[in-house]
Structures are given as C-alpha cells and as structure tokens.
Curated annotation (Swiss-Prot):
Subcellular location as annotated: Cytoplasm; Nucleus
Family under the similarity heading: Belongs to the class IV-like SAM-binding methyltransferase superfamily. TRM10 family.
Name of the protein: tRNA (guanine(9)-N1)-methyltransferase
Chain residue ranges for the region called Disordered: 1-44
Keyword NADP recorded: no
Gene that specifies this protein: TRM10
Pfam family, one: tRNA_m1G_MT
Assembly, per entry: Monomer.
Domain of life: Eukaryota
UniProt signal peptide: none
Species this protein is from: Kluyveromyces lactis (strain ATCC 8585 / CBS 2359 / DSM 70799 / NBRC 1267 / NRRL Y-1140 / WM37)
Polar residues bias (residue ranges): 1-10
Keyword Secreted: no
Any single biological process term in GO: tRNA N1-guanine methylation
Amino acid sequence: MSDTSENSNAEIPADTSDVKDKPKPIVRAPQFPPPPEGISKSQWKKICRKKRFEETRAEYAQIRKEKRNRAKLARREKLKEYTDRGEEIPEELKRPPKVNLNQSDSGISIILDCSFDDLMNDREIVSLSTQVTRAYSSNKRENNYAKIKVTSFDKRLKQRFDNDLSNSNYTKWKNFEFTADPTLPTENAVYLTADTEEKLDTLEPGTTYIVGGIVDKNRHKNLCYNKAKELNIPTKRLPIGEFINLAGRKVLTTSHMVQLMLRYFDNKDWKEAFESVLPPRKLEVDSTKEDSETASAE
C-alpha cells in the first residue's frame, strides 16, 4: 500500500514534446446575458462591450505600461552591451529625433477621413487615436512633411483627444489640422483604398490624398471605395502587390499609410518605402520580382 501511495505522489515528469506541435486553444467570442426587453441584440452587445471596456481599461493600461517598461529595459541592456564592447550602436537602436529640423515640404496634402466613428467600438476609437498621434509623429520626423487634416472630428474621437489625450496639445500641432467639417475635396484629390484596381504609381505635389480613418478588422468591405464613388473622387491603391508580399491582409493602418507616403519622397521608391516602414512580421519580400519591379519603379 505504501508503494502505491508513494507512486501516486511521485512527481510527474514534464512533457518534453514540442509545444509548437500542440494546437492553439480556440478563442471564443464573449458570451453576453440576454438583452432586456426593448433592446436589440446588436444594441445590447454594444452596451456590454462598452461596460467591459470601462471595467478593464485600468488593467489594460497597466499591461501596456509594463510592456513599455520591459521594452525600455531590454533596449538599455542592449545599448550597454555595445558600449561595454566599445562598438558603435546600430542605427535600429538609435532613437530618431522628436523633430526633424531639416524637413522639406512634400507638396502634397493628406486628409484623414474620420467620418466612420459610429462603425467602431470604443477600443477601435482608442486604436484610431493612437494611429492619428503616430501619423503626427511621422509628419514631424520624416525628411518630408505634408499638410495633414483630420475631418469629421466631432464625436468619440474628439472626446478621446479632449479627455484622455488632453496633454497632447493636439490643437497646436504643426502642419496638422482638426476640423468637424466632413467635406472632402473632389478636385485634385485621390481616395486611397485597397478595394480599387487602380494603382498609385507616384505621388503628385498639389494633390490631396484621402485616407480612411477607421479601425474595423476588415468588417466593412468597400466602405471607403463606395464613399469615394458616391462623391466622384478618384480611387487608387498603394502598389503593395507590385513590390512586396504582405503576410496577411493587404490593408494597412492609417498611420502606416501616412508614413509610407512621406517616406516615398526620400527616393521616390515604393519598394524601399515599404521595406523600411512596415514591420518585418507583415513583410514577405518576393526576391523573384525584385529586378523587374525595381526597373518598373524607376
């Protein structure tokens, strides 16, 4: 009996099988209680999601803070390794200046069309506000800047900036304007959308490029394309497939769209702009196309 007891309490050896071969757990959609009488299911889901967002806001803020602190610590340790060895610090570890004092005017204007506020949940509004601030940072730091305007700035996105991001002083941002006016130009304007077949070969000074300010995880197909068609604004797409392969969706964030256009003016080379701006996890360079596509870009 004692042997049986000892065996039952013996330490079970750890599973040494390759964890990569194990299937990932299925992430199921959150379950909400039945909606009260008089409230539709979609309205009730929005209410529940908003409530859950408010309840977990502080927790997520703490998680993001800890993640930033870990990244800072890892960077400091990496820098120390180079300095201890007396080696030059690589460019990718150097922080870019907050303001580029040697900027040139690209000659283009960019509009962030933020008229899709009602189609996003609260988390997506937070994400969009982050993308807008990143677009502003790019406009300060890149070698070329654009005149950027945020339109339809009058709902939750504005509340986000006025309440949670009030320290940003966004009303004083240089070359960056916020307006509640939803009007979009129809002359010398191009609406950029991945849903069109027309390819954007070059950026032309004097032209306004409109970017849809929406975070929707691809829920709303042809949203920007249909709006542009209704307003008789020409549509074009960045030449992503012609120069690179993207891992996953060929839909870029609003901030990446802005940074790519600004970076394009460095050498007027889309391939170089894509490879220098997009994170490696999204980028899959097709080396078989390199020679022909480089020639076509010149």
